Design a protein with these regions (language model features):
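A secondary-structure micro-motif
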Residues: 1-133
């Protein structure tokens, strides 16, 4: 059985050919436990090209994450189909990796909206994954 590098531990980025899928949360010998971006308990700091930042949470639906945005905190510049990137804040995910695009904008209250983001990477379309060290 191949030996796993000691450099690989929890909180490493997991990718497939389409992009970021999630991150490692546990490594045991040659097995990696991965939490997907779309998992309800996962969060990832994101941004768009207009410097809108948000901490997105998994929606619990395949390939979907969301941000709840308080519209009273200033101008928010986002729109449907706009590309979303990893912000690099938090130190786990590299800055500037395209992770998806805005799929839907839902009004929660007159002062708050929910942005639904459709992720680029689908973990079900690949049998091969990489771990960024």
């Amino acid at each position: 059985m191949p030996e796993v590098s000691s450099d690989i531990d929890s909180f490493k980025v997991v990718i497939n050919p389409e992009g970021i899928v999630g991150q490692t949360i546990k490594v045991n010998r040659s097995l990696f436990e991965v939490i997907l971006l779309s998992d309800k308990s996962h969060k990832i700091p994101i941004q768009n090209e207009n410097k809108f930042f948000c901490e997105a949470s998994g929606l619990g639906i395949p390939k979907k994450i969301f941000c709840d945005v308080d519209l009273t905190l200033g101008d928010k510049d986002f729109e449907l189909k706009q590309k979303i990137y990893s912000s690099g804040l938090g130190g786990i995910f590299p800055k500037g990796i395209e992770i998806g695009s805005i799929y839907e904008i839902q009004d929660l209250t007159p002062k708050e909206v929910r942005i639904i983001i459709d992720l680029n990477a689908d973990p079900l379309t690949s049998n091969y994954f990489g771990v960024l060290l």
